[in-house]
Amino acid sequence: MVLHQQRFSLDHGAFCQTLAQTENLLIVQDLDGVCMELVQDPLSRRLDADYVRATTLFAEHFYVLTNGEHVGKRGVQGIVEQSFGDASFVQQEGLYLPGLAAGGVQWQDRHGKVSHPGVGQTELEFLAAVPEKITNCLKTFFGDRPHSLSPEQLQTGIEASVLDNVASPTANLNTLANLLQDFPQIYRDLQETMAQLLDQLMAEAVAQGLGNSFFVHYAPNLGRDERGKEIIRWAKAGDSGTTDFQFMLRGGVKEAGVLALLNRYYHNRTGQYPLGESFSARQAPPSHQDLLHLVKAQFDPALMPLIIGVGDTVTSQVDEATGEIRRGGSDRQFLQLIQDLGDWGNHGNLVVYVDSSQGEVKNRQPLQLETVAGQTQVVAGPGDMRDREEPLKINVAFPGGHDQYVAAFKQAAQRRRVHFSQ
């Protein structure tokens, strides 16, 4: 059975062969938890230099798509530079990871040139003030209640939690969640306080005439409510729930980023932009069906590549009180779009899941494995086992996490180099 017809395949050899021998190929890959460990402090992230080199062998067939950012203190640019120990070498050799960050509104090329298509200066100025507000909110929160953290722990926790991203300032509570693991109610109150802060920021944006500029992203989440707002995943025993509270530019959603990347890919192949040269993720329609319709209307299906979507954040949870299924995860929508585009074009696109639950962040459900007739199989995915109508079909799984995926990716890159040099 071919890979796109399989569920949770562990045939990584076939996966490598697909990447190595498919000429018209587009890889759209998340970063954190996929090609590097999911850690509490983003400043401690590391990238394998050989993996970075391997991405260059895919040339214009590889793009990243992340809710993190390329630039800034916690940007991926610095992680790549650290991998090689020489920023000028990375820039000259074109070793930066190309693609979209901040959900789809921050573009970077191989040489580290960064832009924000469709973003106004007033919007960036508003975002620049957000990190200080997050810092002040955290200080007030801990100043208003008794807690067991030492001054040093609290300072470390706050510094690790405030991500001063240019286009997506974020409160990342991973470190504080770990420090507060014996005080679940304080952490639960902290989640609620962060959500209230983001609501307050939205109100301030509206007052300044920027009501249509931003939205709130929670990661991981439980999907969206009837108003289109993302639903927080509250912490529970052994599960830190939503840890990333992001104030993002509207249009900065990964599924819109898929269209922006596909638009660039077609231009690389044909010299023409199906959606126009100036198209950005911010111009994409908001609904899944409208995104599909736009692709069907503007992109030549005969030129459509085999798209490989790679992510690590997909959730589903059954509400114990109502029985309602909440499906979420920051990678769900872009992976679903890639799956549906494959169904439309009959190209057999692949949805690839990397199990990042072994990392420091404890809010992922690990894949469950069993040995059946001598073969290891995935018997339970990252969602709720009671969700029998899960629409997202994960084709290939990497239960060994980012190390296992990176090893396969590097192998595929070398095979591709040999295959297309003959």
Swiss-Prot record:
UniProt keywords, alphabetically: Hydrolase
GO MF, one annotated term: glucosylglycerol 3-phosphatase activity
Catalytic activity: 2-O-(alpha-D-glucopyranosyl)-sn-glycerol 3-phosphate + H2O = 2-O-(alpha-D-glucopyranosyl)glycerol + phosphate
Residues of the active site: D403 (proton donor)
Coiled-coil blocks: none
Record carries keyword Cell wall biogenesis/degradation: no
InterPro entries in UniProt: Acid_Pase_AS, GGPPase
Catalytic activity, EC: 3.1.3.69
Top-level enzyme category: hydrolase
Domain of life: Bacteria
Database matches in Pfam families: Salt_tol_Pase
Role, per record: Phosphorylates glucosylglycerol-phosphate the precursor of the osmoprotectant glucosylglycerol necessary for salt adaptation of Synechocystis.
Subunit description: Monomer. Interacts with GGPS.
Family membership: Belongs to the histidine acid phosphatase family.
Protein's name in the database: Glucosylglycerol-phosphate phosphatase
Gene name in the database record: stpA
